[in-house]
Amino acid sequence: MVKFPFMKIQMMMGMKIKENELFEKLKSFFPDLVQSSQFDSWDCFTAKHNTVIELKCRNVHYDELIIERIKWDALAHKRASEALGTIYVCWTPKGTWAWNLGSINAPEWHIKRLPRTTEHLARDWINKEVGYLHIDQATRVKLPE
């Protein structure tokens, strides 16, 4: 199982990083980390730890961070069908948290109106099924500068 060091929370107030920057910082923990294809349901993979990792960068910090059910289900399927570990890593302005999704229960699901994608300026809003992961269930990750 993948373990991140328990360290002081990293404060990056006023800074926003992108998923590709988060990926590069995580390579200090997983030197063999490789990005997935754009068609995969996760962002990267470490063969040494036999684990797929999903990355999210949020502009605002909440103690409960959102995960879409479609993402949870895809990662759960990957975990069950290929015996892989599944980690969800979320960066916020107040720090970075990692959840080992195989060691926690699925969250309670809710319908929430959200943008179809956050990658484009034109936002098409749709209903999405989402759950919330509390940071108390996660490991705080101290990223390199």
Language model features: what each stretch is:
Residues 35, 52-54, 87-90:
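A structural signal for short, well-ordered beta-strand segments and their strand-loop junctions
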Residues 59-73:
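Active-site-adjacent loop/helix micro-motif of nuclease/hydrolase catalytic cores
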Residues 1-38, 81, 96:
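Acidic-basic catalytic patches of nuclease active cores, encompassing PD-(D/E)XK
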Residues 79-105:
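Nucleic-acid nuclease catalytic cores
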Residues 69-83:
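Basic, amphipathic alpha-helical patches used to engage nucleic acids or provide basic targeting signals
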Residues 44-61:
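Conserved catalytic cores of phosphodiester-cleaving nucleases, focusing on short active-site segments
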Residues 97-145:
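Intrinsically disordered, low-complexity terminal regions enriched in charged/polar residues
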